Amino acid sequence: MKLNVDGLLVYFPYDYIYPEQFSYMLELKRTLDAKGHGVLEMPSGTGKTVSLLALIVAYQRAYPLEVTKLIYCSRTVPEIEKVIEELRKLLSFYEQQEGEKLPFLGLALSSRKNLCIHPEVTPLRFGKDVDGKCHSLTASYVRAQYQQDASLPHCRFYEEFDIHGRQMPLPAGIYNLDDLKALGQRQGWCPYFLARYSILHANVVVYSYHYLLDPKIADLVSKELARKAVVVFDEAHNIDNVCIDSMSVNLTRRTLDRCQSNLDTLQKTVLRIKETDEQRLRDEYRRLVEGLREASVARETDAHLANPVLPDEVLQEAVPGSIRTAEHFLGFLRRLLEYVKWRLRVQHVVQESPPAFLSGLAQRVCIQRKPLRFCAERLRSLLHTLEIADLADFSPLTLLANFATLVSTYAKGFTIIIEPFDDRTPTIANPVLHFSCMDASLAIKPVFERFQSVIITSGTLSPLDIYPKILDFHPVTMATFTMTLARVCLCPMIIGRGNDQVAISSKFETREDIAVIRNYGNLLLEMSAVVPDGIVAFFTSYQYMESTVASWYEQGILENIQRNKLLFIETQDGAETSVALEKYQEACENGRGAILLSVARGKVSEGIDFVHHYGRAVIMFGVPYVYTQSRILKARLEYLRDQFQIRENDFLTFDAMRHAAQCVGRAIRGKTDYGLMVFADKRFARADKRGKLPRWIQEHLTDSNLNLTVDEGVQVAKYFLRQMAQPFHREDQLGLSLLSLEQLQSEETLQRIEQIAQQL
């Protein structure tokens, strides 16, 4: 249908629309009109993706000079594929309405691992190996040698793309990863470089967060993108952690040993080249004196090691004299390596700021700050000059150079923690140097500054006001939306006591208490008897899950549960988990019913939707606090308190509740879906925890469901499931939670829609 959203004509590819979708579009349009950033929380399963695409594409067509591109960032490959499918639907609706093909290009971009079609490269399992192999076939000097001698290994797909692919832009249309690969096979072009080349003139680009947030990748892929773009971070409740990970470096003893052998290899190569081709080293020296940035010289295939710091921090001047010649630079790296090794020989934990680390470095081995800043850039130049084909082997040394560049660039927002052993195994010496970023706003700041509108959206962003604080930006709109329901299809409840009135909680003091573990077991047992099909249960950590399940086994509870449903368990091994998931779904299909035991913050809690009968109940055993004894976390909490005045307890509770909401939100994936949300811990009933749940869950959490015993919870569940079992047709939803075009235009409906969004 065609909608009028605040004066903008929007094509919406379905016959009916949810009221909150319309409300969401209104907020989005306000954000785009103001050319500012927005934070929007929309309940899961209410068609967030299609509303975003429909509105922004309509905006692009109405104001082609204002918004030139939509950059849609999602987390996992399946999510990227989902967005592309929605976009395809939207475009075919446009074409059907207008009766002509639109000059519109939308495509997905992923890593070489997901896009490469070269027969020698595709069988490799790990992304790092694929990148290394690709580089060894496409680097400019490899190609130059191939021009001389055609028998040498090369990549014909890249050669073809280089000759023909650049002249012919991608034909208009929507391309997911498989479409790109199919096109590559047909034309004989490399799909990965074709996609990277095409994002510059595409109308919609869908890719992963890292392409914008990780400076090492963003520098290669996204730096040409125009300012007049709208960036959407979908499922962005975890965005601060992505920012922090992209700027942090961990160095272990093993990494440093491998750095040593990397340096030895480079030393030998330099000596060999000195004897055979000294001119090459002289040319490099001259380039470094002139201070040319390597990037402009190197072709796209070579620019493999990008600078780990943000673009505005990279120095544009010549490389310092002390590291210009190859031998001097290798000697410099050796001194740095020896110093870091020496620092790892500690007996107790050390925590210090980057300036303190640098002054120690200057005193011990006379290394100044300035040459350190050029480390990453200088190593990139050296590996290029020495024509090192497989860069994957040099990743330890690259890591060390990245650390050197980061530690000398940033004085604030980072901390260095040296731990002599892992807390869990204090007897085994396993020293690690954590160079940890504590300020999430560092990585995302260039994105906010460069693009005119950035939208952060997810189903679980409560409390909204904490995101602008920790990411340090000023949104023009902040809104959270409720779920309009014709029947209440979610039933959240907090179970705080067992049938024997013992308070149940996963807190440290009562964690080992046999009565608490027994009551948790009883809860699962009784729920498995009344809930049809699938139940997903989340524990706070792998360790806690293992000890609880072992205890249930001894008490004979597991045996009783298995009479009702089959049990599957998520483990830390990805392959095992996917088999468990597959079998879990099979058991739900067969009507045998199944229970999946998994972990908050694990793979299952983030990216997997339990649609309809795959998840009729989600049980959250305990409050999923992060491991609070971690020193990195303590340093970050201190930083948040000093810089942004966020109290430690507030942040920890916020973090736990966003993960809890993320877990229970897996059950509701649409308005026709229904599910129980069981919070099994008495602490959830406290106002500070409950108030941090998303508004659409809070609204249905009645006072009568706050501190139930297991029996009372089971009674509530029975009553709810009996109601949900009544036939439910689309007609029941019309006018309430599903609107046709006529209904949408009535005054009364528009007033109701006004109340859906709650601005902050």
From Swiss-Prot:
It is an enzyme of class 5 (isomerase). Gene3D superfamilies: P-loop containing nucleotide triphosphate hydrolases. A motif (DEAH box) lies at residues 234-237. Residues 438-637 are annotated as: Mediates interaction with MMS19. It catalyses: Couples ATP hydrolysis with the unwinding of duplex DNA at the replication fork by translocating in the 5'-3' direction. This creates two antiparallel DNA single strands (ssDNA). The leading ssDNA polymer is the template for DNA polymerase III holoenzyme which synthesizes a continuous strand; ATP + H2O = ADP + phosphate + H(+). Binds 1 [4Fe-4S] cluster. It is found in: Nucleus; Cytoplasm, Cytoskeleton, Spindle. This is General transcription and DNA repair factor IIH helicase subunit XPD. It comes from Mus musculus (Mouse).
